[in-house]
C-alpha cells in the first residue's frame, strides 16, 4: 500500500513503491495541500487589492500636484504681466519727468524776468506821468527845461488847464505905454510868455515893432477856464527874437481858427529850440491853423524839407492839439 507522510506543513509527501525488489531506491511524490493553495490565492488577491488602492492614491496625489503646478505657472505668468506693467509705468513717469523738467534756475530766472518787466513798466508809467510838454525828440536839438516856476512836473495825460500867472517885467521906455494888463490866450495846453503891445497895434492885426524884454522870456504862464471866460480879448502882444508883436485876439479858442502869426506863436512857445527854425518856413507858406492840423510827417519831410526829429516832434504836438478837449466852440 502507498504510505503517505508529510515532511512540510504545506506539502504532502507520498512514497511510490517500486517493482524491483533488488533495488533499494525509494521514490516519493510531493503534492501541495489544498488549504495552502486557497490561502495563497487569498493572499495574492489581497495584495492585488492593496496595490490597486495604492495606485489610485498615487494617481490622486499626482493629479493634485499637477493642479498645483498649473496654478503656480499661472501665478508666474500674472506676476510677469504685473512686472511689465509696473516697469512701463516707471519708464513713462521717468520720461515725463525728464520731458517736463524745468531747467536749472528756471524758476528764479522767470521770477527775475517778470520783476524786470514790471519795473520797466513802472518806469515807463513814471516817465509818462512826469512828461513835460516841451520834450525833445531829436538828439541834435535839445529842449530847455523850466526849473523854478514852470509847472512841468505835473502829469499831463490830456490837455489840462492851469491858472494863469501874470508877469511883472521891468519898466521899459517902449513897453511902459501899454495901457492894458496881460490877459490869457484861449490856447490852454502850452505855456506862453507874457506879451505886450505898443500903442500902434490894433485888435486883429500883428503889426507894430518893439524891443524885446529880456526878463519876459523866462516866465512861463498858463490860465484857467474862469480867467479865459472872464477876460475879454485885449490888444496885447508877445515878445520874440524877431522883434514883432502878436495880438492876443488872433489866438482863438480852437486851433483851426488860428492865423499864421498864431501858428508862429504856437511854434515859439511850444519848443523854441526845435520849432523856431520853422517860423520863416511857415510864414512863407502861409500855414494857418487849418493847414497846421492837416500837416503830416510825409508832407513835412518831402515837401517842406523838415528834419526827421523836428517833424516827429511837430507831429506829436499836432496830435495833442487834435486830441484836446479843452477847446470850446
UniProtKB/Swiss-Prot annotation:
Compartments, as annotated in UniProt: Nucleus
Segments forming domain SAM: 258-325
Family: Belongs to the SCM family.
Job of this protein: Putative Polycomb group (PcG) protein. PcG proteins act by forming multiprotein complexes, which are required to maintain the transcriptionally repressive state of homeotic genes throughout development. May be involved in spermatogenesis during sexual maturation.
Protein name, per record: Sex comb on midleg-like protein 1
Domain of life (superkingdom): Eukaryota
Main location: nucleus
GO cellular component, one term: nucleus
Any Pfam family matching the protein: SAM_1
Record's keyword terms, sorted: Nucleus, Phosphoprotein, Repressor, Transcription, Transcription regulation
